[in-house]
Each structure stands twice: as C-alpha cells, then as structure tokens.
Amino acid sequence: MIQMNSYEGEGAYVIISLINPKGAYEKTLSVLGPDKQWYNTLKEWHKFQTKSNGKLSAITGASVGGGDRAMRTIEIDDAKLNKGYKLRFESAVEEQKYHVTDVEIPLTVESLAERANGKGYIRFVKLSKVQ
C-alpha cells in the first residue's frame, strides 16, 4: 500500500523499481501514471527505461492524488531477498519537485515487514506478503 502525503497539484506519478546490489535499475515493477508523455519527469528511471529498449512490461495504472492511497501487487523473486536488492519508489508531480528516492526499501525479510516512510509525495509504504 502506498499512502500519499497531502499536497496541492496534479496526481503524482510513482514508479516502483527493483534496484540491484550495485545500485542500478534491474526491472520496473509498477508504474502509477497513465500518460507516457510525463514519464520523462521521472528522470533517473526514464534514462533506464529508454536504454532498455523503451518497451514497458510493468503493470501500469492511474496516478495518485494528494492524501490518497494506492494498492499494488508486485512480484518479487524470493531469491532476491537478503542479497542486497532494494525496492525504489520514485515520484513526480507536474511542475513540482521530482523525488528519485521518495522511498527505498532493502529487500530483507525484516524490512518487508516494516512500514517505510517517504521523503516526498509519499507518506509511507507498507508491504504485505501474499501467499
């Protein structure tokens, strides 16, 4: 679950990415924001996305407004746990600040059980394992 802070303006675009142990993007897991024309406002992710042939295979959906929450199901291979991988949540709002690491969660058993606080438009992220 992604809980947004209350803020003025358009809905936030949020990207959820798998970051490898070297700190590089490995895979886009989810995109919250429907219009491709705004993807370039998520600058670091957009660089990765254009280098990786531009074809987006992640789940996409609506942007998230201030104070709203969004639920997403993402698949993470258990082999990535406790190996130095992270989940990165990037956020951007039209004509406002871009947050490259609004939330970053280490892929450890302990971290996945805790609430992670955001630094920008995201108030917090809470993950739940689906059996």
Model-derived segments and spans:
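Beta-strand signatures of extracellular beta-sandwich domains
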Residues: 15-19, 88-90
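Short amphipathic, basic-aromatic surface patches that mediate peripheral association
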Residues: 1-8
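Compositionally biased low-complexity segments at domain edges in trafficked proteins
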Residues: 106, 114-131
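Exoplasmic/lumenal beta-rich domain surfaces
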Residues: 26, 30-72
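Structured interaction patches on ligand/partner-binding surfaces of diverse proteins
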Residues: 95-115
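A short, structured loop/turn motif at beta-sheet edges
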Residues: 20-25, 77-85, 110
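Short acidic/polar inter-strand loop motif in beta-rich domains
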Residues: 60-72, 79-81, 92-101
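Short coil-to-beta strand junction motifs in C2/discoidin
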Residues: 9-14
